[in-house]
């Protein structure tokens, strides 16, 4: 297996060698997800792909870590392919791959997630994006791929009926990763967040994050004893400003959003200095 060195932590234009690359593949839907294996199918012919993913469904856990319980890794097989199944979260999977299993990837790919990861909301809650951010924080360029699901109930259904959509998505994964390997990872970017519409009618669009993906709501129900319990639920946002990831997906374009780990609000520093009389 060909190993690559991690890039400098400073965002820069990362170039790749001409050797067969090593790609670490993970996700948050679990090691048995059809989306994960669609990504594998897109990559394995021209890259050494190491699969290390959660053993179970871990959607919406963001970049959380398992620090109060031990982590176990088992090997699982899919045909003649061996993968690592981690009894933890997506971020745990990345950390164990890098620091326990000795994987030295040239690039980390997270996905294909079943369901879009758009807007401020998804970036901070998505386990798919969280895994990519974790890899980037350790110096590895990372790409998160997600497929739009118009009916959110499909998120947790048997995904085999999405085979036709995964076929198109595999082409996107293959093209995006080949472009990166041939031309280099973009400067000042830690993670590329790629969202694929359920039906592609346009091309690539470079976007920025919308504010919302969902209209947040809470559904109250009663258990058999009359005690209330709640589901956090709500419909998808139907539109967003031009140039945002949500708007691009609604147009049928493939949204590519550059993400950085630096969450500092630089534009707010002057107001903070005035607030604390530091001018």
UniProtKB/Swiss-Prot annotation:
Transmembrane residue ranges: none
Pfam families from the UniProt entry: SurE
Q: Which GO terms describe its cellular component?
A: cytoplasm
Q: Where does a divalent metal cation bind?
A: 28-29, 59, 113
Q: Is this entry keyworded Amino-acid biosynthesis?
A: no
Lineage top rank: taxon:
Archaea
Show the GO MF annotations.
5'-nucleotidase activity; metal ion binding; nucleotide binding
Record field: catalytic activity = a ribonucleoside 5'-phosphate + H2O = a ribonucleoside + phosphate
The protein's required cofactors: a divalent metal cation
User: What enzyme class is recorded for this protein?
Assistant: hydrolase
**EC number(s) for this protein?**
3.1.3.5
How the cofactor is bound: the record states: Binds 1 divalent metal cation per subunit.
Q: Which keywords does this chain's UniProt record carry? A: Cytoplasm, Hydrolase, Metal-binding, Nucleotide-binding
Q: Where in or outside the cell?
A: Cytoplasm
Q: Does the keyword Hydrolase apply?
A: yes
- Biological role stated in the UniProt entry: Nucleotidase that shows phosphatase activity on nucleoside 5'-monophosphates.
Q: Which family does it belong to?
A: Belongs to the SurE nucleotidase family.
Q: What is this protein called?
A: 5'-nucleotidase SurE
């Amino acid at each position: 297996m060909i190993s690559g060195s991690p890039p400098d932590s400073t965002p820069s234009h990362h170039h790749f060698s001409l050797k067969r690359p090593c790609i670490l593949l993970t996700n948050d839907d679990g090691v048995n997800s059809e989306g994960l294996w669609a990504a594998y199918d897109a990559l394995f012919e021209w890259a050494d792909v190491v699969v290390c993913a959660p053993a179970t469904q871990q959607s919406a856990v963001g970049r959380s870590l398992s620090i109060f319980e031990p982590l176990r890794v088992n090997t699982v097989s899919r045909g003649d392919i061996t993968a690592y199944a981690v009894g933890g979260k997506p971020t745990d999977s990345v950390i164990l791959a890098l620091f326990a299993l000795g994987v030295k990837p040239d690039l980390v790919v997270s996905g294909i997630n079943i369901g879009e990861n758009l807007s401020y909301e998804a970036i901070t809650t998505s386990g798919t994006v969280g895994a990519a951010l974790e890899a980037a924080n350790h110096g590895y360029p990372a790409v998160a791929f997600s497929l739009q699901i118009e009916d959110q109930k499909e998120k947790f259904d048997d995904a085999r009926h999405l085979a036709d959509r995964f076929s198109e998505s595999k082409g996107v994964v293959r093209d995006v990763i080949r472009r990166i390997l041939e031309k280099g990872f973009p400067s000042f970017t830690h993670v590329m967040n790629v969202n694929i519409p359920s039906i592609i009618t346009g091309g690539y669009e470079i976007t920025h994050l919308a504010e919302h993906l969902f209209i947040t709501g809470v559904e109250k129900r009663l258990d058999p004893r009359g005690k209330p319990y709640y589901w956090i639920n709500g419909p998808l946002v139907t539109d967003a400003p031009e140039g945002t990831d949500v708007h691009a997906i609604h147009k049928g374009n493939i949204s590519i959003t550059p993400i950085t780990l630096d969450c500092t609000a630089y534009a707010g520093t002057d107001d903070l200095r005035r607030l604390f009389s530091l001018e």
